[in-house]
Each structure stands twice: as C-alpha cells, then as structure tokens.
Amino acid sequence: MYTIISTTNRIGSNTLKVARQYQAFFAEESIPAQLYSLENFTSLQRDQHFDKTEQEILIPTKKFVFIMPEYNGSFPGIFKLMMDLSDIKQSWYYKKVLLVGVANGRAGNLRGIDSMTNMCHYMKMNVYHEKLPISGISNELENDAFIKESTIQAVKNQIKGFIQF
C-alpha cells in the first residue's frame, strides 16, 4: 500500500495541494495511493485517534511519500510528533519513502529533506535517491494544480522511479 502524507496541520496549505497532485499522478500510473493529511491530527500522546491512524494507515503502508513544507529550516513539528508517538518498528522499519520538499523560498526545503533523510535512515527506512525540492511553490500552482510543464515532468519522473524502487 502507498500512502502520501501531507505533513502539516495548516488548513488549506500548498502542501496538501501538492499531495493531491502526487495522488493524481500515481493514479495515472494505475497505483492507488491513499492521502493522509495532518490537518485533522489532534493527538498529543498515544490515544484512540492515534491508535486508529497507526493501525489503519502507518502499519499497513509499505511505501510512503512525505510532502514536507519548510518550517524554520526543517519540516513541521506535528509530523515529528506523529513519528515520535508511533511504534517505530511496526510503522517505519524497512519501509520505502519518497521525499518531497515544498517552499516559497529558493531551496524547496532542501534542509528539511536532508534532516528527514537522516531520521528515516535512523528508523531503518529506505529513502529513494531522487528527492525533489519544489521551490517558489506559489508560482508553481494555479487552481490547486501544477502549471509548469517542467515541474509536472519532474514529479512524474520521480514517481515512475519510485514505483520501480
């Protein structure tokens, strides 16, 4: 099972728009990928809500796509909290992950991607080599969809490679 995680809890974020684009592009490759947004993530500790998320989403997933906005040179703390609450061995060990950075700045959350790569390696995850930092995100989207052909092709190529990974 593939799961795309929009790693911010901000409502109406560009991150979620990008995650939906990834979901659509996976569908074009006949790969069903569920989308999990942290917009409604409310757990501050292991609770019934979190246990359900872990059992129904995290544990069954074999391949993850993390869409990560840049927050203070890294990725959102709410995503780190979710990871910290989880059973690391069941939720993350030996699973595959594709990393995507999203930012209005020039680097496309490259530092956050690097930081997450280190975390994923610590959690024994296999990180796909082609990481995509998408910079100037406000200029990349119109009506919640990518508008630049070069970005569309980069995303589609990344997805095709990840499917083979």
What spans do the regions from the language model cover?
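Phosphate-coordination loops involved in phosphoryl transfer and adenosine-cofactor binding
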Residues: 94
